[in-house]
């Protein structure tokens, strides 16, 4: 996707907002977390699934309003390969919904994001 496409989406939706997807399992509504934890246990896989399900709900609600989403890689990396799989599936779903995707994969970020990178790589 090109930035020309993003500009077209902004014009069509009359909205330049980008929805940030900076997921933390504890921010996912309890009923979504419970369903994922019932299926996978309170594991990285369960947390990653909860985040994916929450993201899908957000994108379903926002896809007619916002032109783009921005998943923050640190929060997915923190959950190991299961989190990266959730990020991949989030990106694929966003594209299916016609959303422009801006992957936030920078390093040297603000404190909370730097902490998430640290947790993901150093434990």
In which residue ranges do the predicted regions lie?
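Active-site loop-to-helix "anion-binding N-cap" substructures in soluble metabolic enzymes
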Residues: 1-123
